[in-house]
Amino acid sequence: MTDNILGNLQQKKHNMNGNKISGAEAIIKSFLSEGVDTVFGYPGGAIIPVYDVLYGYKKELRHILVRHEQAAIHAAQGYARVTGRTGVAMVTSGPGATNIITGITDALIDSTPLVVITGQVGNSGLGTDAFQETDVIGITQPVTKWSCQVRRAEDIPEAIARAFHIASTGRPGPVVLDITKDAQVHTMEWHYEKCNFIRSYIPYPDISDEAVAQAAELINNAERPMIIAGHGVMISGAEKELAEMAEKADIPVVCTLLGLSSIPSSHPLYKGMAGMHGNIGPNVNTNKCDVLIAIGMRFDDRVTGDTSKYAPQAKIVHIDIDPSEFNKNIRATVPVLGDAKTVLGKLIPMLRKNGHKEWLTTFNRPEAVEYEKVIKPETEPSEGMMNMGEVARRVSEATNNDAILVTDVGQNQMLSARYFKFSRPDSIVTSGGLGTMGFGLPAAIGAKIGQPGRQVCLFVGDGGLQMTIQELGTIFEYKVPVKIILLNNNFLGMVRQWQELFFHKHYSETPMVNPDFVALCKAYGINGEDVVERKDLGQAIKRMLDSDEAYLLNVCIQPYNMVFPMTPAGSNVDNIMLNATEHYI
């Protein structure tokens, strides 16, 4: 690696005021120039100069001290997902830097814009195995959109400007800047210019009018069209266009897990969630539609199942800003490269006003079967211990379906996503592609800090909560009033479900002996209560939501709660289990 990785860049002298400042102060002033108001982080030796400068900028820049560096990334993700802004985190070298890897991988897969600053040893210590030296660039290159080491103070403003531009444009993602101690302590002439262009980086390619016209022709001639909306709809801010397109052409809309809330749950054309634990209608009709319009989604295996049997009858229109997603998993008849909002803006005027009444009625039977066989038993049980689905439904109803749902990973994620309802966009924060247990608690902190005026409800299992439970300390210190619904079944529930269905009920290392979670919350200065009986759930939810402070409900769930419907991994999407013994026919 050269001594100055940015040395080939022309040094900019715009907006210079003659003030010499340290590289550490340049980092803080660069953040402020980008409109950053919150940084999640954890100090250490190689980043101390920046924290020393931060001491004098407390009024301008809020810092949230997490209890583990992984949590800094997840909190920044939560913040970014609910605000549409770039999340910012800052950690030290060595273990501080290695602790961020899970978080930035999660952000890369789920297209979350982050700028992460890692401290690094001094220039002379590079490559010497100095104390807390790690090859941050080598480690992070595979799991970031861009990573760069900065060794000179004068290169810091341009590196940060580029980082924000790259992280937030095109398909968003995480950027890591590894800044040596020399760069932090040496001085430079302060200047800053936001980056709007990088040669060879084209975040918003020209949209092919021919491809849009071909897509319009397929949709106009379709008898059984279906839209599958992914996370890219909300990233581009195309929620209005999605609804307008669906209404004009009378097309049913289904969502991926990360696409939930891109259209209101109450919309008459919304037909549910697609995927392994999605609704029956969307999955069955994937293999019956004649034109499938995929918008801002990547045909993940949890949506497609067996790709050789996924929508073989359909012509597929795939709209995405990332060309690498085209034909990667599912071959598109018409790939349309571009930002979803811009593409739909061109496509909608070409669509004929249409009606598909008969096609829309084909969702009725699977909806009825799902209600009787799955939804009613899960959400309206009359006896026994509580189910996860009924808790999610009742919390959603108590918030008038207007809360931000944050989930951890596992059964809690799938059942809350299934039974929570959404009235406005950007209302779900979850770990989709990587499936990171421990994501939920810090992500909820970031979401609440980003949207303090909205109720933030975290659904988490007893396994996932204990992976980042130390962040209760962050909640207490900063008085972050998140509502934590702990679905406690004393199991690693999703793994246990697979063991029950596919591994002869060999519950190998999935039962859990748990602490007293309410007492633990009390030790952290957080309110909490146990909810054992169904009759007590309603008032407990009310007390939680009425509280102005953080609150935990430890809800005792029946240990063998299952998530259905379920399409077994690697199966075709219309091979759907209604329960352990019945399939949808």
Label each residue range with its predicted role.
Residues 5-18, 154, 192, 217, ...:
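Phosphate/pyrophosphate-binding active-site segments
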Residues 5-6, 118-159, 259-363, 541:
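Glycine-rich, acidic loop regions that bind phosphate or pyrophosphate groups
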Residues 24-28, 32-37, 45, 50-55, ...:
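Active-site diphosphate/adenylate-binding microenvironment
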Residues 24-36, 78-84, 108, 166-171, ...:
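Glycine-rich phosphate/diphosphate-binding loops that line cofactor/substrate pockets in enzymes
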Residues 48-123, 127, 131-132, 276, 281-292, 296-300, 414-492, ...:
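Thiamine diphosphate
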Residues 81, 231-317, 422-454, 468-469, ...:
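Glycine-rich, anion-gripping cofactor-binding loops and their flanking helix/strand elements
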Residues 166-221, 375-376:
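Conformationally flexible catalytic loops at phosphate/diphosphate-handling active centers
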